[in-house]
């Protein structure tokens, strides 16, 4: 009898565990569409432009270090420098190829979506996601989504600036101008009057427990994920650039031949 009772109890434990797993799977499935829709309310174009600007800067630093090293190895002399047309061709070639890789690994944000979905799934219940989605689909909610996006981009650039990572180097003017233009437009778009009576719902949401929780999740945690990705890619750039050394050697030989 005792053996039978133990078997029954073990079976009940297994069934309870299976039911728990099934319920968790059902809840995850219920969250999937609201999370996708909620993420779709946001636009991280500005944060991407900031990352592109910094990664272009770091790619040029790595490329110029490589070209300098190759010049020393090949004994090309002082004329092999940033002003030389063949250097510029080599730099441009490498820059385009490296930044194409950056576009794949960062700018598309394909890497971010799974992490963002997982973050929202961990932080919010299905009921909370429904409330969030309803709010952000409203006019004032869409405005607050822009505020979140702008705050994320501001935190990303502040992280880079305060850590001394942004440098003033030649070759990043286009990326810097684009970043500044997008940032300024986003700054204008997200502004609204707090005296407008229609913003009462927005203020109630901002001060609510769920609103505060969302802003912390979306701003602090999302910023951390983006900043980590930027740092990770920046650290990998020298290796990525050095692996392409053979691609510019014909230009070094052309420089040698032209020098006579």
What is the role of each PLM region?
Residues 110, 115-216, 220:
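Extended amphipathic alpha-helical interaction segments
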Residues 62, 66, 89, 93, ...:
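Charge-rich, solvent-exposed alpha-helical interaction surfaces
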Residues 8-17:
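Bacterial N-terminal signal peptides
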Residues 204-260:
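A cross-kingdom marker for long, charged
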Residues 1-9:
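Bacterial N-terminal signal peptides that target proteins for export
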Residues 46-55, 59, 63, 120, ...:
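Surface-exposed patches in mature extracellular/periplasmic domains of secreted proteins
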Residues 30-111:
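Early exported N-terminus immediately downstream of N-terminal targeting peptides
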